[in-house]
Amino acid sequence: MPSTLTMETYRVKIQRGLIERLGLEILRLNDNIDNEILLITDIENSNLYLQKIIMNLQEYPRNAGMKLRFCELIINSCEDAKNFEAVSNLLEKMAELGLSKKCIVACLGNDVVCSVAGFAARCFSVRLVPVPVTLSAMIEASSGGSALLNLNAGKNLAAMPYAPSLVLCDTECLKDSPCYE
C-alpha cells in the first residue's frame, strides 16, 4: 500500500514473515545501494530476530551473485534514549564504520529505535527502511513520515521529516511485543 502523507511516496508492506525476508526486500531496492546494510536495533529484538535476518542476508546475495556488507548497532530502546545524544552517538558509530552514502539503514524495534535511527539516517543522508515491531511503531512509521526526539522541555518536540524507502510491518512481531506497547 503506498503512503502519500509526505512529499515523496513510499511503500508500506504489512504481512507475516517480512523479517525473515528483510535482506531480499532491501536488496530489491537495489537501484542505488552499494550493497551495504546497517541494522540498528535494541538488544531484545536482536536476540529475537537477528539470526533469521543474518541467515536471509547471507542466502539471498550469494544466490544472486552479489556481495553484501552487513553491520549491526545496538541502541537503547527506552523513552529516555530518544534524544540528540543518542543520535549523535549513532552518527559517530556510522562514521567509524566507514559507511558509504549509498548504504541503507534498516531499523528494527519500537518507536524509540525507529525515531533515533530515522533521525540519524536523515542526518547521515542515507536511505531508511523502518521495520517496526510494536503496533504503535507500525502506525507511526507507516503514516508519520518524521522521526521525533524528546527535548528537556517535552516529549517529541524535535522532528526530522523523511520519506523512508520502504516500511516493513511484520505482523508476526506483534505476538512478541509487550502488551503495553
Map each language-model feature to its residues.
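Residue-level detector of flexible, active-site-proximal loop/helix-junction positions
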Residues: 77-79, 112, 135
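Glycine/serine-rich anion-binding loops at beta->alpha junctions
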Residues: 103-122
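ATP/NTP phosphate-donor binding region
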Residues: 1-103
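Alpha-helical elements of the RecA-like P-loop NTPase motor core of helicases
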Residues: 48-51, 115, 137
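Glycine-rich nucleotide phosphate-binding loop and flanking beta-alpha elements
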Residues: 46-47, 112-114, 175
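A glycine/threonine-rich phosphate-anchoring loop and its flanking beta-alpha core
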Residues: 118, 123-181
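Alpha-helix N-cap/helix-start capping motif
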Residues: 16, 43-44, 111, 133, ...
